[in-house]
C-alpha cells in the first residue's frame, strides 16, 4: 500500500480509540523525505509518496476504516548547546555554519545530531554543551537565509 496524503498527527486527534494502530519507527532524517518505505511493528511494509505536506513525529495514515499507521521518530544522540550571551551565540553559529551542520534552534538552545568532530571543536573552543537522547518532532534543517 502506498500513502500519498497525511491524514493527521496522532497528538492532535483524540478520536482514534476505535482503530488499531501500527507503528513504524523512522529516523529524523526520514521526516524530510517525500518518498519513503517503512516497516511497521506488525512487519507490514508501506510506501509513502507525499504529494504535499511534510512528515512529523506522530504523522498518521489510515490503512482502512479500522487500522492506522503512525510514524514514530527514533530518539537520537544530540549535542545541545546553550549559549551564554550573544557573543557566544555568534561564535557557535559561525563554527557550526562552517561545518555545514543542520541545527534546531528553540528556546535559546542550539541542537544538532551528535558528531565527534563537532564535540571536539566545542571542547577545544571551551564551549559548554550536553549530549542528550532526543526524539525530534521534525527533521533538522539548514538555516534558510533566502
Language-model features, listed with the residues they occupy:
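Conserved, well-structured core segments that form or line functional sites
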Residues: 87-129
Amino acid at each position: 500500500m502506498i500513502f500519498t496524503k497525511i491524514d493527521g498527527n496522532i497528538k492532535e486527534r483524540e478520536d482514534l480509540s476505535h482503530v488499531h494502530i501500527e507503528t513504524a519507527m523512522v529516523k529524523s532524517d526520514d521526516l524530510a523525505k517525500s518518498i519513503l518505505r517503512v516497516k511497521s511493528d506488525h512487519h507490514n511494509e508501506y510506501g509513502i509518496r507525499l504529494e504535499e505536506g511534510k512528515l512529523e513525529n506522530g504523522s498518521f495514515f489510515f490503512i482502512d476504516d479500522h487500522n492506522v499507521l503512525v510514524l514514530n521518530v527514533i530518539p537520537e544522540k544530540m549535542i545541545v548547546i546553550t549559549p551564554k550571551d550573544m557573543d557566544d551565540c555568534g561564535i557557535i553559529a559561525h563554527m557550526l555554519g562552517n561545518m555545514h551542520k543542520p541545527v534546531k534552534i528553540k528556546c535559546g538552545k542550539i541542537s544538532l545530531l551528535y558528531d565527534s568532530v563537532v564535540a571536539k571543536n566545542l571542547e577545544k573552543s571551551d564551549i559548554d554543551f550536553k549530549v542528550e537522547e532526543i526524539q525530534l518532532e521534525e527533521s533538522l534543517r539548514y538555516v534558510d537565509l533566502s
